[in-house]
């Protein structure tokens, strides 16, 4: 059955702010305490979604989390009315309030790991929400993420939903940001590629020294088992710990794959030649590796421009398009390399850039903003159709953002009870627009 690779992008939430919460993410740290513009951020994301829809791709929308997360703040000892909880947390632990107000769920590459039905033992699409235990502000997402995924992919005949892995450092899981899939055609058996930063139980694997490795081998293996993947078509590889220490906090900051092509930096993986050999052996003939040499694009340029945090997509005419942040065009070395790559006809045919400044300043490029879901025709019909981008949804969500979102948020605004009310009103209306039901705690 013919299949497509759909992209489900996360809507930026109403509390989008720059709190510098993500250790190891240089852009997040460098923009800490700056004023954010949630309305601009959500509209930049919507523009990207609409552009992909207009190019002929199946484009979906995933709802954001409820923030500030009052329930978590109450678990941490703050009490009284919601306004009192905000006031107390701002007074005694502003860092906690910032963490519980993060709009980081916009980066749906971390929402879950997804395996298509052509790869799984039971012939269903499998979803496992990421536990994201390495960062507190993201570790409180997985329950609601699961609710949103179940409301988006509700038909049990086609979709299987798992709980997040245990909330332990042994099973640190960052979702699809450390996972990609290679295939000849999307609806055929593919090779699922899991990249980890460390092993929890086996000290023969080196670990980074400066920044944390967020994904463990054990987590990746558990997801492969849970999804019923075939060993022959599953490859595990370790990310180079030295590049983690230089700001490559997820594999999707240093590599991206699509169909038969792996586009990666020369320093992306530990034992890189063996990784390429393992992938080629599992894939078979025709596997294409575009390895970017350090003397063409330095690691620093790769991280600063988010060259590899791009989307590789296949157009209906068979050509491969790479969707890049505007930062790549603005860097002469990176832009020269990309144009040279297209001229060489090595597997990337066209370049397209987007202005995603609000997301980029918090450390997330085009690939961070999307969760890839391969769907055959029957599965596409089984998806909640109100979550799929079209002209009407684009118009509706822009009007919704104009109605509910602020155009400026600073740290002090997170304690404003009115922001909580605005956020809940926005999400309540959103669940009606997208027919999600009661996915948020405040709706119960």
Curated annotation (Swiss-Prot):
Instruction: Report if keyword Hydrolase is assigned.
Output: yes
Single annotated GO MF:
N-succinylarginine dihydrolase activity
Q: Which SUPFAM superfamilies match?
A: Pentein
Q: Does the keyword Hydrolase apply?
A: yes
- Listed binding positions for substrate are 19-28, 110, 137-138, 214, 252, 362
Per the Swiss-Prot or TrEMBL record, the active site comprises 174, 250, 368 (nucleophile)
Provide the reaction this enzyme catalyses: N(2)-succinyl-L-arginine + 2 H2O + 2 H(+) = N(2)-succinyl-L-ornithine + 2 NH4(+) + CO2
**GO BP of this protein:** arginine catabolic process to glutamate; arginine catabolic process to succinate
Cleavable signal peptide = none
Q: Which UniProt keywords apply?
A: Arginine metabolism, Hydrolase
Give the Pfam families listed for this entry: AstB
Task: Please state the pathway this protein functions in, per its UniProt record.
Answer: Amino-acid degradation; L-arginine degradation via AST pathway; L-glutamate and succinate from L-arginine: step 2/5
Subunit structure of this chain's protein? Homodimer.
Family in the record:
Belongs to the succinylarginine dihydrolase family.
What is this protein's function per UniProt? Answer: Catalyzes the hydrolysis of N(2)-succinylarginine into N(2)-succinylornithine, ammonia and CO(2).
HAMAP family listed in its UniProt record: AstB
Q: What is this protein called?
A: N-succinylarginine dihydrolase
Taxonomic source organism: Aliivibrio salmonicida (strain LFI1238) (Vibrio salmonicida (strain LFI1238))
Its taxonomic placement starts with: Bacteria, Pseudomonadati, Pseudomonadota, Gammaproteobacteria, Vibrionales
